[in-house]
Amino acid sequence: MIRTLEDSLRLVEGAGASNGGICFDTWHIVKLKIPYAELRRIPAQYITSVELNDGMFECPWSLHEDTVNHRRLCGEGEFDLKGFIVAMQAAGHRGPWGIEVLSEELRK
């Protein structure tokens, strides 16, 4: 499992594929406790897309349960989405942005 930005960058750089890159997802960045300041250092050519979602910092269920059933719509959780967006823009991202909310409640 890739747990650091450095590991992600090494993988992408090592692959040497012109169409390779990293999709940055707020949920993963927050759960891995990666400071937004670190995102500003990512070379823009490696940022392929960004996915926004919200959630809680701490939860009573398993990480897997949190991953697939308890993400929230933007603005309905505790994540600093504005800070994340500012950091990605500061890194030079000008590509696609999406919303990814895996939620048992929204699937009903």
Pin down the residues of each PLM region.
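Histidine-acidic metal/acid-base catalytic patches
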Residues: I2-F24, V30-K108
